[in-house]
UniProtKB/Swiss-Prot annotation:
Lineage: superkingdom: Bacteria
Any GO molecular function: RNA-DNA hybrid ribonuclease activity
Protein name: Ribonuclease HII
Stored CDD domains: RNase_HII_bacteria_HII_like (cd07182)
GO terms for biological process, alphabetical: DNA replication, removal of RNA primer; mismatch repair
Record keywords: Cytoplasm, Endonuclease, Hydrolase, Manganese, Metal-binding, Nuclease
One cellular component term from this protein's GO annotations in UniProt: cytoplasm
Binding site for a divalent metal cation: D8, E9, D101
Length: 198
């Protein structure tokens, strides 16, 4: 029997917090309910329910992260690839084939194929997409309690108008990606304003 692993990330384009990556090998004997699709197409409630079902019925799965520090040091693409490797290392069954959403792939001892928009084409990627998004969204709710002034529960760290306004007003928090261009621009502007005061 062939085991296919799907990998997807959550938080690649965000301006705050870790990037999450999930690897998931579905059990051919236990097909997950037909509503598996790109996690962004599902309601939060539906995602939560499916995530529980996937965790229960998948052959093996692992959610890994790359920290803000790693993102700052390596860049977001390399940090995501690092988290992909970590997610694969956490699997208890070796996959025969790994399908990764998008165009980035790590060097791993398995055959790998990248699939653009794979989260809406390949069930194992859809499952990984749901696990990664649910895990990251839940973490962002915790960050919202820690840093309520930024509204993380609403935008999950992505740079909406309100999020940018909050960073301009309060400065970046410890979980903001300070090398991310829009945030770096805010920091540089604030430094220049301070210099003008002297």
């Amino acid at each position: 029997m062939m085991y296919y692993c799907g990998i997807d990330e959550a938080g690649f384009g965000a301006g705050a917090a870790q990037v999450y990556v999930s690897a998931c090998v579905l059990d051919p004997q236990k097909p997950i309910n037909e509503s598996l699709t790109d996690s962004k197409q599902l309601t939060p409630k539906k995602r939560e329910l499916l995530a529980e079902e996937i965790k229960q019925d998948a052959l093996t799965w692992c959610i890994a992260t790359a920290s803000v520090e790693e993102i700052e040091k390596l860049n977001i693409r390399k940090a995501t690839i690092l988290a992909m490797k970590r997610s694969l290392e956490g699997l208890t069954v070796k996959p025969d084939m790994v399908y990764i959403d998008g165009i980035n792939s790590p060097e791993v001892p398995f055959p790998v194929e990248t699939v653009v928009k794979g989260d809406s084409k390949i069930p194992a990627i859809s499952a990984a997409s749901i696990l990664a998004k649910v895990a990251r969204d839940n973490r962002m709710l915790e960050y919202d309690e820690q840093y309520p002034e930024y509204g993380f529960k609403d935008h999950k760290g992505y740079l909406t108008k309100n999020h940018i306004k909050a960073i301009q007003k309060y400065g970046p928090s410890p979980i903001h990606r300070k090398t991310y261009k829009p945030i770096k621009k805010i920091i540089d502007n604030q430094k220049n304003q301070q210099l003008e005061l002297f």
